C-alpha cells in the first residue's frame, strides 16, 4: 500500500505500526486520538518518510510510509 502513496495523498495512520516506534517514543509515547481518527495529507516525501498534516491546528509530523495507509 505504501508504494501508492504520494504527495497530496489522503492517509490514515496505522495504530499497530505506530505502537513502540521510534517516531512515537520521540514524543510522549501516547498516540493522539486525531492521528488515528482523522485523515492526514502528505505534504512531502523524503526517502521512507512522509510529512503529514492532520486536520487539527498542530505541527506537521514525519511518519514512515509503512505507518500510513490510503484514506480512500
From Swiss-Prot:
Main location: membrane
Catalyses which reaction(s): a plastoquinone + NADH + (n+1) H(+)(in) = a plastoquinol + NAD(+) + n H(+)(out); a plastoquinone + NADPH + (n+1) H(+)(in) = a plastoquinol + NADP(+) + n H(+)(out)
Keywords recorded for this protein, A-Z: Membrane, NAD, NADP, Plastoquinone, Quinone, Thylakoid, Translocase, Transport
EC annotation from Swiss-Prot or TrEMBL: 7.1.1.-
Role noted for this protein: NDH-1 shuttles electrons from an unknown electron donor, via FMN and iron-sulfur (Fe-S) centers, to quinones in the respiratory and/or the photosynthetic chain. The immediate electron acceptor for the enzyme in this species is believed to be plastoquinone. Couples the redox reaction to proton translocation, and thus conserves the redox energy in a proton gradient. Cyanobacterial NDH-1 also plays a role in inorganic carbon-concentration.
Protein family: Belongs to the complex I NdhO subunit family.
Protein name: NAD(P)H-quinone oxidoreductase subunit O
Lineage: Bacteria, Bacillati, Cyanobacteriota, Cyanophyceae, Synechococcales
Protein encoded by which gene: ndhO
Amino acid at each position: 500500500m505504501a508504494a501508492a502513496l504520494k504527495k497530496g495523498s489522503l492517509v490514515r495512520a496505522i495504530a499497530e505500526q505506530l505502537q513502540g516506534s521510534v517516531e512515537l517514543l520521540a514524543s510522549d509515547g501516547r498516540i493522539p486520538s486525531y492521528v488515528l481518527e482523522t485523515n492526514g495529507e502528505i505534504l512531502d516525501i523524503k526517502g521512507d518518510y512522509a510529512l503529514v498534516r492532520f486536520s487539527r491546528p498542530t505541527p506537521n509530523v514525519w511518519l514512515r510510509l509503512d505507518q500510513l495507509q490510503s484514506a480512500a
